[in-house]
Amino acid sequence: MRIQDYTKEMVDEKSFIDMAYTLLNEKNDTMNLYDIIDEFKALGHYEDDEIENRIVQFYTDLNTDGRFLNVGENIWGLRDWYSVADIEEKIAPTIQKFDILDDDDEEDKNLKLLGEDEADDDDDIPAVTDDQETLNDPEDPEDDDVDEDLNETDIVIDEDDEDLDEEDEEEEEFEDEEETEE
C-alpha cells in the first residue's frame, strides 16, 4: 500500500519510523527531516502540538535504526542505497586543518591567539550591575512586604524551626526509651 493511501487511523496506528521507511522507498530519494514530518502532518491531519511527542520519538528512532542514514544537513536516506565506501565517505568526520605556528609567528606581537580578543572586550563590563545593587536592600519597603507575605503563608520554613522540630522528636524518642526501660 502506498503511503498516500493511508487513512488518519492508519497513520495514528503506524509508527513514524516505519512510515518514513515506506515514504523514502516510494520516493527513492533522500528527504529533509522537516519535509518527512510535513508529509506525516498532512497524512494524519495533525496540528503541531498533536504531533510533537511523536516527532521526538521519531528522531530518536531515525538515529538508532540501522535502515536510515543521515547524509548531512538533516537529509535522510536509506542505508540500502549506498555502498560501504559511499557510507564511509558521507559519514566520515571532517578534519579542520590549522596552520602550525613557527618561531617567527610566536615572536609577532600583533598576532592574537584564539580567545585573546574576547578577553579584552570584557574590560568595560561593570563588576556590579544596577539590578544587583538594589537586591536585598534593607531600606526597600517592598522587601518587607514580601517577607510578611511569606511569613503569613508559611511557605518558607526557617532552618531554626526545622532544627527545633528535630530536637523535639529526638527528646520524645529519648523519653519514650526511658519510660520503656523503667
UniProtKB/Swiss-Prot annotation:
Residues 14-81 form the HTH HARE-type domain. PROSITE patterns: HTH_HARE. InterPro entries: Asxl_HARE-HTH, RNAP_delta_N_dom_sf, RpoE. It comes from the Bacteria. Residues 114-182 are annotated as: Disordered. GO terms for molecular function: DNA-directed RNA polymerase activity. GO terms for biological process: DNA-templated transcription; regulation of DNA-templated transcription. One of its GO terms (cellular component) is DNA-directed RNA polymerase complex. Keywords: DNA-directed RNA polymerase, Nucleotidyltransferase, Transcription, Transferase. Residues 116-182 have a biased composition (Acidic residues). The keyword Nucleotidyltransferase applies. The keyword Transcription applies. RNAP is composed of a core of 2 alpha, a beta and a beta' subunits. The core is associated with a delta subunit and one of several sigma factors. Participates in both the initiation and recycling phases of transcription. In the presence of the delta subunit, RNAP displays an increased specificity of transcription, a decreased affinity for nucleic acids, and an increased efficiency of RNA synthesis because of enhanced recycling. Belongs to the RpoE family. This is Probable DNA-directed RNA polymerase subunit delta. The gene is rpoE.
